[in-house]
Swiss-Prot record:
Entry similarity comment: Belongs to the nematode receptor-like protein srd family.
Lineage: Eukaryota, Metazoa, Ecdysozoa, Nematoda, Chromadorea
Gene3D superfamilies cross-referenced by the UniProt entry: Rhodopsin 7-helix transmembrane proteins (1.20.1070.10)
Statement: the UniProt record of this protein carries the keyword DNA-binding: no
Compartments, record wording: Membrane
Entry coiled-coil feature ranges: none
Membrane topology: Multi-pass membrane protein
UniProt keyword annotation of Membrane present: yes
Keywords attached to this entry: Membrane, Transmembrane, Transmembrane helix
Main location: membrane
Organism of origin: Caenorhabditis elegans
Protein name: Serpentine receptor class delta-44
TM helices/strands, residue ranges: 5-25, 90-110, 130-150, 185-205, 235-255, 264-284
Cellular-component GO terms for this entry: membrane
Length: 317
């Protein structure tokens, strides 16, 4: 049953994601005011990695068979027709791109929190935050590269998967996740840890932003209410598609109980954010919303002045 649903859902989400992300990238590049330069860089980074995430989900369509020891990766996507190491490499690209997407949500929330406090972070602080996030991504990506070299590229392993997949038609076995191997363990700690830490941190920052705005004037709160709505939807959206499915998958891993829904949807549910996020950005970032309204002929195409805002990093949200 799940395969029938996913045979329609996966390509549909991929096509929608491709369309919305391309439109958003064009809008960001062509219609971002100068005072949105920082947000522009963050959003473009997020768009590129979400495009990568969406492509990898579609081409791999992985079932994480985590009640087996070691965990097996089965691919139902187009890449199952290629050698297993290619699909296994795509799996690690998928993990890294999903990681970057989640961390950009945290970075955006953090920058907006600083702006709500009327604090412009020093270059040293900005560099530290970006370096910290980059180091997490690089460590995870490095572990992925090591795992491909160790667990997928050796000739005897490639021949083993070739023989296994000769007897399979609907899917291919593309690799394993073995937490007894150090790079896999490190990667697991990073990814599973951030699935919990990032949403909690973002929710706490959102709460602080709300307090700061509530304590300010009514005019200031009204001016930034649209921004707050968009921020709330994005944070809760990521929390809902990541946290429950990962908790279910972790329980399955520990108890060795087969939860088929979690196995099939652990990468599909986060895939939905690649469609939802560009829609939220287009609507809740004021300059992009104005441009969208012009395209939909709901507003005249004329130059709009950018109103001052407490959010220096993302003015007039």
């Amino acid at each position: 049953m799940f395969r029938k649903i996913l045979s329609v859902l996966n390509p549909t989400v991929f096509v929608l994601s491709l369309c919305f992300q391309i439109i958003l990238i064009y809008t960001i590049i062509r219609h971002s005011p100068k005072n949105l330069s920082t947000l522009k860089a963050i959003l473009l980074t997020n768009c590129c990695f979400q495009l990568l995430q969406s492509s990898m989900v579609f081409f791999t369509q992985i079932q994480l068979v985590n009640h087996l020891v070691p965990i097996e990766l089965w691919s139902y996507g187009p890449c199952r027709h290629f050698e297993a190491f290619m699909c296994y490499s795509m799996f690690h690209i998928l993990q890294t791109s999903s990681l970057v997407s989640g961390l950009t949500v945290f970075l955006t929330t953090f920058m907006k929190y600083q702006a709500a406090r009327h604090v412009r972070p020093s270059k040293k602080k900005n560099c530290f935050v970006i370096l910290f996030i980059s180091s997490i991504v690089l460590i995870s990506a490095g572990c992925g590269i090591l795992l491909v070299i160790i667990q997928a590229l050796p000739l005897e392993i490639r021949e083993k998967y070739y023989r296994i997949n000769l007897e399979l038609d609907e899917y291919s076995v593309i690799g394993i996740v073995d937490y007894s191997v150090l790079p896999s363990r490190v990667n697991g700690i990073i990814i599973n840890g951030l699935v919990v830490i990032v949403p909690i941190t973002c929710l706490l920052l959102r709460r602080k932003i709300l307090k700061l705005l509530t304590a300010s004037s009514d005019a200031l709160y009204f001016q930034n209410r649209v921004f707050l709505q968009g921020l709330t939807l994005q944070i809760f959206g990521h929390t809902l598609v990541y946290v429950p499915i990962f908790i279910c998958s972790t329980i399955s891993l520990i108890t060795k109980t087969e939860y088929t829904f979690a196995q099939f949807f652990i990468f599909v549910l986060p895939h939905l954010t690649t469609v939802i996020d560009p829609l939220l950005t287009m609507y809740f970032v004021t300059p992009y919303r104005k441009r969208l309204m012009v395209w939909l002929r709901l507003k005249n195409d004329k130059v709009h002045s950018v109103s001052p805002s407490t959010f220096a990093v993302s003015a007039n949200h």
